């Protein structure tokens, strides 16, 4: 197999080295920050309980901040939970101290801040004023307190005027209709509309998004309690998440982006084992969403599961492949969940190691891959920067380099300008190639083409038609 993309000879100082050998590696001493780019996928993170907190050693914090600067255009923080204490413990009394610390850290690393308006103080959901019961964190506010929560959202917007993007709630937590065995999208949308109106009253240019609903996947339609018509080689989408999305699209007062969430697991068989399929799923869902709405698509909670140390390389390749599929299909943003590493086992791929201790805050393989992807997308070579010459091989082209992800468990042998390049199982590699001269990649032997997004999830006229009415 051969194909052409804009590239050039390696830099002079790389002559004689195996093709693809990046002599310098990523320069973490001078990390380049990236502003969100409306023309391509903007990568970001969602900070969770532990994320570059003050009690880490100074060298570890500095190292982690360098990784964060290079990898995250957007940095998202919840207002209560996931690293933030209760901002309004009782009516009329505010405590911004923990949220202030997180916002200060985001500013210090040149991130574009995002706030997720979740969760609600206890007194809004039946608890005693002044108390915070963390076991009830994910309980939704009571309807009689929806206006109070909207007022809290407005107070947050006034305190942090540099925050231009707000997500309303998280995964519709607490909004469940048990009698109907479905999401309580009516109640969520009522809350969303009150929050939307309150934020726009503070500043009409603030960007507000929802519904931050989980899109569940089944491996087999026979096992699905609520199968949808949106199905294909990647599985069957659960109808209940689609119903919630469609109701919100039809009844929202307004929105500036659509927030969604999905993972690499199925409801019936656990983790999706076909690595090429798992990446294609995010591209197919992005394509379907873009046919439902003209709003930008945000993957508000991106994570790919957990593994022990031996499985981290595979998960990293799966994550990068999914990000390439999102970019290829026109997603606007992807927020990586929990960017700081967990010392326990198994754990999710992280961008840097824990900052709790000497030698912490070091960049991990996932962090370097995301930093390189940021670099490539920022300097992308033309409108079609992402290509899939084979189902297991993805490329993202920039003006000065290309990022390759090999998403399979065997070795793959390539050729660039007649010189060999070997990628190992689940390898992600950056090649410092300048744009300008066509380069032929030769993939010896047969390789199945990547499945088009329409086969991964077949789009019928009914599933692809726009759901938005205003």
Language-model regions: role of each:
Residues 9-155, 161-168, 172-183, 213-215, ...:
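N-terminal substrate-binding region of glycoside hydrolase catalytic domains
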Residues 16-27, 307, 321-410, 427-451, ...:
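Aromatic- and carboxylate-lined catalytic core of secreted/periplasmic carbohydrate-active enzymes
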Residues 25-30, 56-64, 95-102, 151-153, ...:
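Alpha-helical scaffolding within the catalytic cores
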Residues 45, 77, 168, 210, ...:
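Conserved beta-strand positions
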Residues 49-52, 80-83, 119-123, 170-175, ...:
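Solvent-exposed loop/turn segments at secondary-structure junctions
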Residues 102-109, 135-168, 183-202, 227-259, ...:
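An active-site-proximal structural segment forming one wall of the substrate-binding cleft
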Residues 184-319:
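Noncatalytic carbohydrate-binding groove/subsite architecture in carbohydrate-active enzymes
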Residues 408-418:
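Surface-exposed beta-strand/loop patches in extracellular or lumenal glycoproteins
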């Amino acid at each position: 197999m051969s194909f052409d993309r804009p590239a050039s000879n390696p830099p002079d100082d790389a002559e004689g080295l195996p093709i693809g050998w990046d002599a310098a590696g990523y320069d973490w001493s001078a990390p380049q920050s990236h502003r969100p780019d409306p023309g391509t996928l903007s990568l970001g993170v969602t900070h969770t309980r532990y994320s570059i907190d003050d009690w880490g050693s100074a060298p570890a914090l500095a190292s982690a901040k360098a990784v964060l600067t290079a990898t995250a255009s957007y940095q998202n923080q919840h207002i209560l939970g996931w690293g933030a204490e209760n901002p309004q413990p009782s009516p009329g009394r505010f405590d911004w101290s923990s949220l202030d610390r997180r916002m200060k850290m985001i500013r210090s690393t040149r991130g574009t801040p995002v706030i997720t308006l979740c969760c609600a103080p206890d007194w809004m959901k039946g608890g005693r004023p002044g108390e915070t019961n963390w076991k009830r964190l994910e309980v939704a506010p009571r309807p009689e307190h929806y206006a109070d929560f909207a007022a809290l959202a407005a107070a947050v917007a006034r305190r942090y005027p540099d925050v231009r993007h707000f997500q309303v709630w998280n995964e519709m937590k607490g909004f469940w209709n048990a009698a109907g065995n479905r999401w309580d999208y009516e109640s969520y949308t009522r809350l969303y509309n009150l929050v939307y109106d309150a934020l726009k009253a503070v500043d009409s240019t603030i960007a507000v998004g929802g519904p931050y609903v989980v899109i569940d996947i089944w491996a087999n339609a026979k096992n699905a309690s609520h199968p949808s018509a949106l199905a294909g080689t990647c599985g069957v989408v659960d109808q209940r998440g689609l119903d919630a999305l469609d109701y919100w699209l039809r009844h929202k007062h307004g929105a500036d982006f659509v927030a969604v969430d999905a993972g690499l697991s199925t409801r019936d068989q656990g983790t999706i084992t076909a690595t090429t399929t798992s990446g294609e799923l995010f591209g197919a869902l992005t394509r379907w969403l873009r046919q439902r709405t003209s709003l930008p698509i945000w993957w508000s909670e991106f994570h790919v599961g957990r593994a022990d140390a031996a499985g981290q390389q595979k998960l990293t390749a799966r994550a990068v492949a999914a990000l390439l599929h999102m970019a290829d299909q026109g997603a606007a943003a992807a927020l990586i969940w929990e960017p700081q590493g967990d010392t326990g086992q198994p754990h999710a791929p992280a961008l840097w190691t824990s900052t709790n201790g000497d030698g912490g805050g070091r960049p991990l393989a996932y962090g370097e891959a995301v930093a390189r992807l940021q670099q490539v997308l920022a300097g992308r070579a033309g409108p079609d920067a992402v290509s899939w010459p084979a189902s297991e091989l993805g490329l993202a082209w920039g003006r000065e380099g290309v990022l390759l992800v090999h998403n399979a468990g065997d070795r793959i042998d390539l050729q660039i300008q007649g010189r060999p390049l070997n990628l190992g199982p689940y390898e992600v590699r950056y090649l410092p190639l300048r744009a300008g001269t066509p380069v032929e990649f030769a993939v010896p032997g047969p390789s199945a083409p990547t499945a088009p997004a329409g086969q991964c999830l077949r789009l019928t006229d009914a599933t692809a038609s726009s759901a938005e009415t205003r």
